[in-house]
Amino acid sequence: DGWFENVRPLTPREKELLAASLPKDEEAVKKVLGVRHWIKDEDFLTSTYRLASQPTVNIQGLVSGYTGPGGKTVLPGRAEAKLDFRLVPDMTKTEAVEKLKAHLAKRGFGDIEVIVSGGYSPTESPENSVVIQAGAAALKKAGIEYSLFPRRAGSWPGVVFTGPPLKLAAGH
């Protein structure tokens, strides 16, 4: 339904940075995340690329029907789902909401009310920006190993700095 049409692919440099930042102990990462394998049985690096470059729709919660003690043989007349979107560069919150509505309508659920309670567009900062280079230099001077993540999974409100009207770089 067009969910991926404005997703900008990772550049060769972004892939290089992601590969360099990959934790060495894949099994420890799986343990922390509570998984036995990566989606579609992909290798660790491919899954890392997917995590950094593809938007997601996450179900935060579902409520419907009778949830009290005992049983009831009634059909629920109402259901709620709380979602969050994790957007990537070149996508917008408005576009994501419209695509969700179109997806629902195409499947016969055009009467579902979609309430948007917040959110923001994705953000990123160039690797060569002053703030990123200053942070890297400070870590290096302190003898601290660091990695540059060209994209993180999900959005964060840094767009208030990196988006119009300021258009400044911001670390995350």
Protein language model features and the residues they cover:
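Acidic-enriched catalytic cores of C-N bond-cleaving enzymes acting on peptides and small amides
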Residues: D1-S64, D90-G110
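Hydrophobic, well-ordered secondary-structure elements that form the walls
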Residues: L83, G135, F161
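Short glycine/threonine-rich loop-to-helix capping motif typified by GTGT followed
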Residues: E14-S21, T123-I132, G158-L168
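A short beta-alpha structural unit
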Residues: F85-V88, E113-N128, R151-G154
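Zn-dependent metallopeptidase/amidohydrolase metal-coordination segment
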Residues: S53-P55, Q60-L62, G71-A79, K141, ...
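Generic non-transmembrane alpha-helical segments
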Residues: K99-G108, V130, A134-A142, P164
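C-terminal catalytic subdomain
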Residues: P69-V97, P122
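Short acidic (Asp/Glu) and glycine-rich catalytic loops that position anionic groups and cofactors
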Residues: W38, G77-K82, G110-S117
